[in-house]
Amino acid sequence: MKKLLKSVLVFAALSSASSLQALPVGNPAEPSLMIDGILWEGFGGDPCDPCTTWCDAISMRVGYYGDFVFDRVLKTDVNKEFQMGAEPTTSDTAGLSNDPTTNVARPNPAYGKHMQDAEMFTNAAYMALNIWDRFDVFCTLGATTGYLKGNSASFNLVGLFGTKTQSTNFNTAKLVPNTALNQAVVELYTDTTFAWSVGARAALWECGCATLGASFQYAQSKPKVEELNVLCDASEFTINKPKGYVGAEFPLDITAGTEAATGTKDASIDYHEWQASLALSYRLNMFTPYIGVKWSRVSFDADTIRIAQPKLAEAVLDVTTLNPTIAGKGSVVASGSENELADTMQIVSLQLNKMKSRKSCGIAVGTTIVDADKYAVTVETRLIDERAAHVNAQFRF
């Protein structure tokens, strides 16, 4: 049985090095691996001894914490219906029969959409308070940066198409978007911002060189969106440090997207994650491979901020945006005609929807290398609910 356990854990640890995979599981034996310190010797007394003091029971460890999520499995967390203008019909041939001025409930194209890519990279300082070489209470303080990419439907990219309102009356018409642009890609990069986490880990059961342990962790960060890219044929644009409207319904203010826009706020993403895990390790001299399972819930909430396409407040060369014409079977009409704006996408906007975990359970495999019972380096890979890699280097005082 011991040989089988050794084989399984060694294979898992070696496999973790061959594939790259926000919160690590960590080695369940970590509280008891470093039993000596660089400044103070470890204490191996009996906790029930009346002569033992808390000074004998407590020790400190510090080190580096690096966590690199290459693909977090996320989906949108939105309502089934979305409020916007009525959809154009086959009877709207030379422009809309009636320009949309009121919102109607339509099926939400963002409902249940999966994100194509979600990355997060964290570098932090690691501090742990150890009790009786069995329990750890720890925290991390550092910085994180992220990247999100998905189909434009996940971000409710919409615009107005086919309007018959002339440009001279457009600013006062209070029209709402009627077309969902679902065949495009939206990506965003966040800035590098402060991140922190807290947690606890306990070695619950030991038998020879095997250790069964559990941990609980919570992490939080609130990065701002540094750059937003919309890759769409009908309306392609990039915004550095985007701003938008929180809680605003259509129609947005006609100044939305211009430098004169008011009532906007910086686009930021509130990241929260909870995680509980159970893991088993087996010590083989300097190496302690382990394998674990975890349950986690993560959310990315940007307050459903609505961001408008950048545009000019006043037309220059008869245009306010660089959106192309979409002639289709018709033709591009001259300025001053009834449907002069019908062939270009107007009042384009998107919103940053709330996202959450698509899968809650995952596995982690890794190994810890201990030197002189004072220093340790842990390498870990996580799979199923995310592809992530983790590195932790620490020493005991």
Swiss-Prot record:
Its main location: membrane. InterPro entries: Major_OMP_Chlamydia. Keywords: Cell outer membrane, Cell shape, Disulfide bond, Ion transport, Membrane, Porin, Signal, Transmembrane, Transmembrane beta strand, Transport. GO terms for cellular component: cell outer membrane; pore complex. One of its GO terms (molecular function) is structural molecule activity. The keyword Zinc does not apply. It is found in: Cell outer membrane. The keyword Transport applies. It comes from the Bacteria. One of its GO terms (biological process) is monoatomic ion transport. It is a multi-pass membrane protein. Residues 1-22 form the signal peptide. Belongs to the chlamydial porin (CP) (TC 1.B.2) family. Part of a disulfide cross-linked outer membrane complex (COMC) composed of the major outer membrane porin (MOMP), the small cysteine-rich protein (OmcA) and the large cysteine-rich periplasmic protein (OmcB). In elementary bodies (EBs, the infectious stage, which is able to survive outside the host cell) provides the structural integrity of the outer envelope through disulfide cross-links with the small cysteine-rich protein and the large cysteine-rich periplasmic protein. It has been described in publications as the Sarkosyl-insoluble COMC (Chlamydia outer membrane complex), and serves as the functional equivalent of peptidoglycan. This is Major outer membrane porin, serovar L3. It comes from Chlamydia trachomatis. The lineage of its organism: Bacteria, Pseudomonadati, Chlamydiota, Chlamydiia, Chlamydiales.
